[in-house]
Amino acid sequence: MRTERVSPLLALGILVAGLCSRVHCLPENVTPEEQHKVTSVDGHSLASSNTDFAFSLYKQLALKDPNKNVIFSPLSVSIALAFLSLGAHGPTVTEILEGLKFNLTETPETEIHQGFQHLLQTFNQPSNQLQLSVGNAIFVQEELKLLDKFIEDARVLYSSEAFPTNFRDPEAAKSLINDYVKNKTQGKIEELFKDLSPRTELVLVNYVYFKAQWKTRFDPKHTEKTEFHVSDNKTVEVPMMTLDLETPYFRDEELGCTLVELTYTSNDSALFILPDKGKMQDLEAKLTPEMLTRWRNSLQPRRIHELYLPKFSIKSNYELNDTLSQMGIKKIFTDADLSGITGTADLVVSQVVHGAALDVDEEGTEGAAATGIGIERTFLRIIVRVNRPFLIAVVLKDTQSIIFLGKVTNPSEA
């Protein structure tokens, strides 16, 4: 007969942010002498699973409130959960990785971690054209002893920092973690954790910081207040940017949507997807990795004589416990085996929180966001009006990773 136990708690903090500031790279690259070698596994081999997870998580978040903005980093959530799985055993690790859409008969657990290691190394390469930093941190109760193997795997595979923390003083612990987050996001996310239990033993944090400039920038002198149609009976005024450029474009008659891709100076890109009026929920239901591949293969350079895109800044803060449970990741909250972290099997996850912030302006994308596109044709002229709800996917070219995914329903709401 099983007896009830009061388990120590573990929390996951996942955050994404970006703004016009300098960023700092993570710890140095892994040397050839490291215990864990990077194999032929690379970001592309993870792209399909990560994209599948991204769309599955998006659908869950969008269903909770179809009329709200959605912004999150699927890559950040994936990295945090994969990081957690380093310390999981048995059905717990299987549930986490299968929940992340990995087929463990095709991709062994070791290769998954090596793939994320490769992604982190790729993301944190210095660049003059892109500010991108991805990192992990462990905040651990002062007297808690972590297993040496977990510490080493966390450092080598996930570039993780570690900080002793007194969770028995939850306010001080919360301040320590939130200050770390605020510093790493240059003040963009100020309060990732709103509260912590004094029973917390461990907090894992993942962050993404992103800043990129458009290859063809908008002229601020041409930005004007314009109507944005939130719904049939609600209209708001937003600052609307405008531009004349040649850029990849595709009209999908089958799904009833229009796509425009804007490229950053780094050659990464933001894909804006505008469903026809009344088609948003139909389109959301059909989002799959295969659909994204079809869209990207169908994009062709076209001259857009007038592109109108709203300038906006939005934030989000999600508690993902219920959402992840609905996606099949349940054991971590109830009867987890996380004995690979401390050597005992009495840790459970108390909360998974995710914060995101996105600014889009004339210079480029800061963080992540969503934008949309409406199309008018007058003979050979193409006019793209982003004046109703739309989707956005920010994709990193080198790995085809979706670093941000979202929906902008109302650009005037922060």
Curated annotation (Swiss-Prot):
Predominant localisation class: cytoplasm
CDD domains: serpinA3_A1AC
GO terms, molecular function: serine-type endopeptidase inhibitor activity
Subcellular location(s) of the protein: Cytoplasmic vesicle, Secretory vesicle, Chromaffin granule; Secreted
GO CC terms, sorted: chromaffin granule; cytoplasmic vesicle; extracellular space
Keywords associated with the record: Cytoplasmic vesicle, Glycoprotein, Protease inhibitor, Secreted, Serine protease inhibitor, Signal
Site (Reactive bond): L380, R381
Domain of life: Eukaryota
Glycosylation site list: N103, N183, N233, N267, N321
Segment forming the signal sequence: 1-25
Pfam family, one: Serpin
Subunit structure: Homodimer.
Function: Serine protease inhibitor.
Homology family: Belongs to the serpin family.
Protein name (Swiss-Prot/TrEMBL): Serpin A3-6
